[in-house]
Amino acid sequence: MGELEWFDAYCKLDNAPGAEEETLELIRKAEADAARKGVVGIRDYEMAENVDTWTRRFSAASPRPRDANDSAWTGIDWDGSFTHGIRGLRVEAGVYPERLEDAIEAGWKTGVELPGSDGLGHVGAMKMISDGSLNTRSAFCSMPYSDIFPDFYGTLSYAPDQIEAYFHGATCHRFAIACHAIGDEANTIVPNAATSTHAHGSIEHAQMLKPADIPRFAKLGLTASIQPQHAMDDRDVITRFWANPGGIPYAFKALHDAGVRLRMGSDAPVAPLDPWMAISAAVFGTESSDREPFQPEQCLDARTALAASTAVGRDRPEPGDPADLVLLDRDPYAVSTPEEMRAMPVAATMLAGRWTYSSLHGE
């Protein structure tokens, strides 16, 4: 089954009897777990009717108060009162190209607040997938997949002119773009489309880049949305299948040095929803002190990695910022091993001026 066929199948599953209630309960558990890790927001690029779905989720009523005996409390209402709808995360709900026309007709555009969300939910970017992935050998590359697949370069999900057409439609109707591009050839085609259409937004993953394309990201104002934990998961596969790459894999520091805005995430559920795993991978280039770093020349310093993990692109709040705060029990700039960074203890998390997690009772 291809991705577009899965899109329609997933939407039908999402609307099956009882699915919405069960999913909402799972989301409440997930947002509590996210708060324990210091997460205050997500971008939902699931192949689904995300705008309508999240509008319903923000308006749904919760059947349970928080557990007053929970020593490490998670929830929105500190007094234990009932919470209505999802209130533990900011959400940007992405729109796929196949649903873009419907979203435009409904009056949506990137940045519009979702009804009933109290400012926590907004319409996100138009999400588009230009190529495949490394592990499936379907990321579209300028060089073949080594001697194992000597005549195979990966695949494109859309022809370049189709990508350009979707970018044009999104841009004309005030949608940002968020385009998945992993192979180095895909990461040439996507900036080409952004150049001709004046599209703005992000390139998702940007895992393999030709050196000449890196400064283009900065020139075009495109954000590189990266998931450093993928480098840890893929390092052995990269060595096997991208032994003679046409570009630089996981070029974090090269992008930063070129002035490209970095935005770090997890790509959950592909990797766990845990920012400290991503930060650790970006800073140390390895999951274990017992293994040498992967591409140490592309590692980031801790301050840059932490800033890239925030919505505002800074590691410290400033007057006028939303009151989304994370209190830590350890100085992240004094950490010396990947194990310590991955185990970063979060003491409390605040979202929009309200605590969503705290282990500081009585202190």
Language model feature labels by segment:
Residues M1-R87, A93-W108, M128, N135-A186, ...:
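Divalent metal-binding segments
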Residues K12-N15, E25, F167-A178, E185-G201, ...:
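His/Asp/Glu-enriched, well-ordered alpha-helical/loop segment
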Residues A60-D67, F82-L89, V112-G119, C172-H173, ...:
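Secondary-structure transition/capping motifs at alpha-helix termini
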Residues W73, F82-K127, G201-Q207, P211, ...:
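Phosphate/diphosphate-binding loops
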Residues L120-S138, L222-A231:
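Non-cysteine beta-strand/loop elements that form the S-adenosyl-L-methionine
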Residues G121-H122, R342-M344:
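Short, small/polar residue-rich loop motifs at catalytic or cofactor-binding pockets
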Residues N135, T356-Y357:
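Short, isolated positions in well-ordered beta-strands
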